[in-house]
Amino acid sequence: MTEALSRAELREMARESGLDILGVTGPEPFSDAEHYIVDHIERGHTRGMDWFTVARTRESCDPHTLHDTVQSIVSVGIPFWTGLSEPPDDGILRGRIARYAWGRDYHKTLKRRMTALVATIEKIVGRPVEARTLSDTARIVDRAVAARAGTGWVGKNSMIIVPRHGSWVMLGEIMLDIHITPDLPLAQDCGRCRICLDRCPTGAIVEPYRIDAPRCISYLTIEERGPIPFQLRPLLGNRVFGCDTCQDVCPYTSAARPAHDPDFEPVTIENAFPSLERLATMTSADFYATYSGTAVIRAKRSGMARNAAIALGNSDDPHAEPILIQMLRCHDEPLARGHAAWALAHLTGDESHRPLTLALQSEPDPSVCVEIRQALDA
C-alpha cells in the first residue's frame, strides 16, 4: 500500500503542533484489551460505574465503530510534569490536587493541538482528510492504542509509561483515512518491580495491571457522587482531587524531566494545593471562578467540599476544628455537612460530641443525621 505520509514527517509536524510524543498503529480491533476489560467488569472492578458496560467496551475496542474509513490511528502524548512537588510552607492547611488537573483542561489542550496537526496533514497530502480526534472523553481504549503504537508500555499501575517521561503524559488519538506504516510496540515492561502495588494508599491495585476502581482515590474523589466509604476516608490524607501516589513512586516516572508547558502549569497555588478552608467554604461563584477551564470542575463543588472536609479531618491540626464546625452548621450541601460530621469526630474525638449533638438538633437532612449519629457513636 502506498504511504501518503511518512512517520518522520508526521513526527516533525506533531512537534510543531505541541505534541511531543507520537506513535502509529493500524485500525485492527484491540481484541486483547477487549477480553481484559470484559473480564475486569465481570470481576466487579468497575462497580458503581453503570456506563462502563460490556457493550461499550466492545465498541471502544473496534476502531471502525468510531471511524468507518480509518486506515491509521496516531497516538499522541503531551508531557505535563512541572517539577513542583510540595505545597509552600505558609502555615495554611492545604489539600492536594492530582498534577494532571493543575493547568488547563487537558481535553481542550489535546483537542486544539490535534486539530492543528490534522490541518497541517491536509496541507501536506493536498486534500481534505477524514479525521477524528479523541481523548479519554470518547469511546476508545487510549492505553491499548498507545501500547500497540509504541508510544509507551502498560505499567503494573495500568498507566502508560513513556520513555524519559514516565506516566506524566496526556494521551490522545487521531484516526485518519490515510495509510501510515505502523510502529512496533516497545519491548519493555516493569520487570519484578511492584512498588506501585505496595504503596497504593487504599490497596486499589489488587494485582499487577488490575485496579479495583471503587477503592482508587481518583475514583472516590472525582467520580463518586455520594458519600465515601467510612473505612477509606482516613486513607485519603489531604488528597482532594485524584491521587498521584502510584506515579510518584514509580522509578520510571520519578526520573521524568519538567516539561515546562504553560498549559499544564498551575495558574495559582490554589490550582495545585488549595486552601482547605477556602475549598470548604467557597460559594458556587468562587468555585467556578477558580476552577472553570480545568479538570477539577468534573468533581463539582459539592464533591470538592466533601473531599475538603475529609482532608481537614485527616489533618491532625487543631486549626481545622472551627472550619469543620462551621461546615457542619452552615454549608448548603448535605454531602459536605455529613462528611464534616465524620471529620470533626475523627479529628477531635470526644470533644466533638457537643457540636455534633447541637447540629443534630437542627439538621433537616436525613442523610446528614445518619452521618452525625454514626460520628457520635464512633
Q: Where do the PLM segments sit?
A:
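Auxiliary alpha/beta "docking" domains used to position bulky ligands
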Residues: 1-189, 237, 364-366
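Flavin-dependent oxidoreductase catalytic cores
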Residues: 185-195, 205-208, 297
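Structural detector for internal amphipathic alpha-helices that build alpha-solenoid repeat scaffolds
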Residues: 305-316, 337-349, 369-378
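Short, charged low-complexity linear segments at domain edges
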Residues: 161-185, 213-232, 284-288
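Alpha-helix N-cap/helix-start positions at coil->helix boundaries
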Residues: 298, 302-303, 318, 332-335, ...
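Iron-sulfur cluster-binding cysteine motifs and their immediate structural context
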Residues: 16-19, 29, 195-219, 225, ...
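Amphipathic alpha-helical scaffolding segments comprising HEAT/armadillo-like alpha-solenoid repeats
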Residues: 286-290, 316-329, 349-361
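Glycine-rich phosphate/pyrophosphate-binding loop
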Residues: 268-306
